Amino acid sequence: MKICRHSESTDAPLASPTSRRELLQLAVAAACWPLLAAAQERSPELLPLRTTGLQHFGMQVADVEVAGQFYGRLFSPTLTKEAEPPLRYYVKIGSDSIAIGGANGRASRIDHYCALIEEYHPAAMIERLRTEGLTVGNQGLVGDPDGLRLQLLGMSESASSLPAEALASRRPSVRITDEGPVVTPIALERVVLLVSDLERALPFYRLFFGAESRRDADGVWFQLADTRLGVLTAPSGEPPRIDHYCVNVAPFDRDTVAAKLTALGATLAGSDDADELHFKDSDGIHVVLRAA
């Protein structure tokens, strides 16, 4: 943190103002000083984030309609979407959500993840991060050394904080099927990132989330309220990426859900955890369902 210091002795006498302009300048400075002091006191509290946890993540896919149908049938048949083109769906996963947008010719991927922040002050955060050499882009997105993007979002900015009428106007809803969802989602459980160099990446994540809660041979884990963020070393030869997400769901029959996933076009994957069911959706995105 850069600190400005005066070179003059603090014991030097104050010069007497010689004009109305100087008197006005002194009055303005006196009025502003409490605000500046308060800002300086607040700035250390901006980081690590005071977060209520991971709130949503976004994916970019080849066909938004197809992906919306898949995730709507899996988690929540009633989707919301942006009122204006391009098509962008939002799928509820219990208290959290998935944002689905078009990849526009790029490979399908999880594009970003979002931490919801208490008492968030965007302008102050932008200035604070600038001192760390970080730039906050559109919609509060900031990238780690590999370009993996974290979205900073205040609780008051979240769509879930809007009154029902305002939300319906901003994001009209559409029901894609009369059938119930394959599983009953509760909330996002974790998001896992694969980075090219763990030690290079760690200062970024510690800046935002504080000390890790656990470290093992594969990487580190941060506990963010009731959610977890895994920052692991990418296997040799594989690119850095947001690798997968896991949703806590109500207890389910594994064979029944596996059969329904296959019917929807998913590809099942192995897992060492009996409480988890791993699969890849039709865009190749890795998804985990965990029985809560």
List where the protein language model places each region.
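Short, low-complexity cationic-aromatic patches
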Residues: 47-51, 63-65, 90-92, 104-107, ...
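Short, charged/polar, Gly/Pro-enriched secondary-structure boundary elements
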Residues: 96-100, 107, 148-151, 157-160, ...
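Core segments of cupin and vicinal oxygen chelate
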Residues: 14-18, 26, 49, 59-98, ...
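N-terminal beta-strand motif that seeds the catalytic metal site of vicinal oxygen chelate
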Residues: 39-65, 110-113, 157-202, 228, ...
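Vicinal oxygen chelate
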Residues: 62-66, 108-109, 113-149, 155, ...
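N-terminal secretory signal peptides
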Residues: 1-18, 29-32
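Ordered, small/hydrophobic-rich secondary-structure cores
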Residues: 40-43, 55-60, 71-139
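N-terminal twin-arginine translocation
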Residues: 17-25, 31-45
